[in-house]
Amino acid sequence: MSDILAVAREQVLERGVGLNQDQTLQVLQLPDDRLDDLLALAHEVRMAWCGPDVEVEGIISLKTGGCPEDCHFCSQSGLFASPVRSAWLDVPSLVEAAKQTAKTGATEFCIVAAVRGPDERLLAQVAAGIEAIRNEVDIQIACSLGMLTAEQVERLSEMGVHRYNHNLETARSFFTNVVTTHTWEERWDTLRMVREAGMEVCCGGILGMGETLEQRAEFAANLAELDPHEVPLNFLNPRPGTPFGDLEVLPAAEALKAVAAFRLALPRTMLRFAGGREITLGDLGAKKGILGGINAVIVGNYLTTLGRPAEADLELLDDLQMPIKALNASL
């Protein structure tokens, strides 16, 4: 059998054709002593097909907690013994958060709400926030508001939402182990409508929720079929009181192999470091990830957990001589 890294070099690096599901599994199964070679190849692929720029994004939780869904990893579910809840953010708070995000050099600001899908009150608050931000801050606005109807997709597009995030979370075959209150197909339908409306699609998931390597490879193939503009990669940070609260953190080498494997499966896609990387990888692992296929980061804190200080990520990018992606000139 041909060495999978030699195959990937010819197929992915030279021709820009992502690995298929079986090939991705072979990468995930590589022994740890091949990790450095794997990361180096993934970095070459990233530089060849995405370039040196790194997109920086900040996120804010407009509505925290009280969600009716049972996503087993999430402390914002109202169904678990993990009460995370706070008042809705008002418009001035959204604007101030966008300003602080822009000061880091970020070009993307994502407004997030813990809901199954937005109701009229939430959409009105989002619309008011977007209008105020666009009047005061030079930044692209993304949203993550759960599952949408066709009419809601159209309204968000008309508001000027640049990109919509809705994660598939995991492989289709593993989804019912993670969520039971809605289906994988419902999430897929929202993503399809978002693309049809002309917004960029942002879709990723969480690694380390008990899925097998085969299912991790399946998930990469699911994402390749969707072909999103951006894939955020999260690593499970077990939350007390949730069904996944007692799972072990993914070993760093396994997490880095996954990062590189997803890059080789998705050579032209923006691959973003998201939640959980602090406890899974630490500072050294963050550097290895950025030198192993990652070309986008979330700076600052996440929705319910602390992230690395924005300054630490920005200093790392500067040390690695990786420029922050400039704001789209069309804005």
UniProtKB/Swiss-Prot annotation:
The keyword NADP does not apply. Residues 52-277 form the Radical SAM core domain. Binds 1 [4Fe-4S] cluster. The cluster is coordinated with 3 cysteines and an exchangeable S-adenosyl-L-methionine. Pfam families: BATS, Radical_SAM. Its cofactor is [4Fe-4S] cluster; [2Fe-2S] cluster. [2Fe-2S] cluster binds at C110, C143, C202, R272. CDD domains: Radical_SAM (cd01335). Its EC number is 2.8.1.6. InterPro entries: Aldolase_TIM, BATS_dom, Biotin_synth/BioAB, Biotin_synthase, Elp3/MiaA/NifB-like_rSAM, rSAM. One of its GO terms (molecular function) is 2 iron, 2 sulfur cluster binding. It catalyses: (4R,5S)-dethiobiotin + (sulfur carrier)-SH + 2 reduced [2Fe-2S]-[ferredoxin] + 2 S-adenosyl-L-methionine = (sulfur carrier)-H + biotin + 2 5'-deoxyadenosine + 2 L-methionine + 2 oxidized [2Fe-2S]-[ferredoxin]. [4Fe-4S] cluster binds at C67, C71, C74. It is an enzyme of class 2 (transferase). PROSITE patterns: RADICAL_SAM (PS51918). The keyword DNA damage does not apply. Pathway: Cofactor biosynthesis; biotin biosynthesis; biotin from 7,8-diaminononanoate: step 2/2. Keywords: 2Fe-2S, 4Fe-4S, Biotin biosynthesis, Iron, Iron-sulfur, Metal-binding, S-adenosyl-L-methionine, Transferase. One of its GO terms (biological process) is biotin biosynthetic process. Catalyzes the conversion of dethiobiotin (DTB) to biotin by the insertion of a sulfur atom into dethiobiotin via a radical-based mechanism. NCBIfam families: bioB (TIGR00433). Belongs to the radical SAM superfamily. Biotin synthase family. Homodimer. This is Biotin synthase. It comes from Mycobacterium sp. (strain KMS). The gene is bioB.
